[in-house]
């Protein structure tokens, strides 16, 4: 691991433990990291490359951005390194509270389902009785009014 100032290392470790995830663009010349302003992007990339090799984070690379997520081993390591109590967990491990419903319907206004008067034969019309065919013509004998009559066979 390259020589990185201790303040930068601690800032990266604290941010990673607090959030549980870290995103960094693949830009080795970027002066400041987008989320951690006091640290260069190169420092973040180098530290998390080291974390990946020790299996403290899982890495995903997509569209020129690195995405790192802490693993259980990484949480244990950072907890001992930063001397954080067991009660403190990263934001990705916290359960989100269920959102309170802004609108609740009373029992009278709730829909109870179909009323039971659905009749599927209504949509079919009278096709079963041959209503979609011209009168008197059976299957395969359809012709338009303008067409000539079928030739007579002798």
From Swiss-Prot:
Record has Nucleotide-binding as a keyword: no
Annotated protein name in UniProt: Small ribosomal subunit protein eS10
Family designation: Belongs to the eukaryotic ribosomal protein eS10 family.
Keywords assigned: Cytoplasm, Ribonucleoprotein, Ribosomal protein
Keyword Ribonucleoprotein assigned: yes
Region (Disordered): 91-154
Protein location: Cytoplasm
GO cellular component assignments: cytosolic small ribosomal subunit
InterPro entries tied to this protein: Plectin_eS10_N (IPR005326), Ribosomal_eS10 (IPR037447), WH-like_DNA-bd_sf (IPR036388)
Organism from which the protein derives: Dictyostelium discoideum (Social amoeba)
Primary localization: cytoplasm
Basic and acidic residues biased stretches: 124-135
GO MF: inositol hexakisphosphate binding; RNA binding; structural constituent of ribosome
């Amino acid at each position: 691991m390259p020589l990185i100032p201790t303040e930068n290392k601690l800032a990266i470790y604290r941010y990673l433990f607090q959030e549980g995830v870290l995103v960094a663009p693949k830009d080795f010349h970027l002066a400041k990291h987008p989320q951690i302003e006091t640290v260069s992007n190169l420092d973040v990339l180098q530290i998390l490359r080291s974390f990946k090799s020790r299996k403290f984070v899982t890495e995903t690379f997509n569209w020129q951005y690195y995405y790192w997520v802490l693993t259980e081993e990484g949480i244990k390591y950072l907890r001992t390194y930063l001397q954080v109590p067991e009660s403190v967990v990263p934001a990705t491990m916290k359960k989100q509270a269920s959102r309170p419903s802004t609108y609740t319907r009373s029992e009278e206004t709730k829909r109870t389902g179909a009323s039971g008067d659905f009749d599927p034969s209504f949509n079919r019309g009278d096709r079963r009785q041959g209503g979609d065919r011209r009168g008197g013509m059976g299957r395969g004998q359809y012709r338009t009014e303008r067409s000539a009559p079928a030739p007579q066979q002798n």
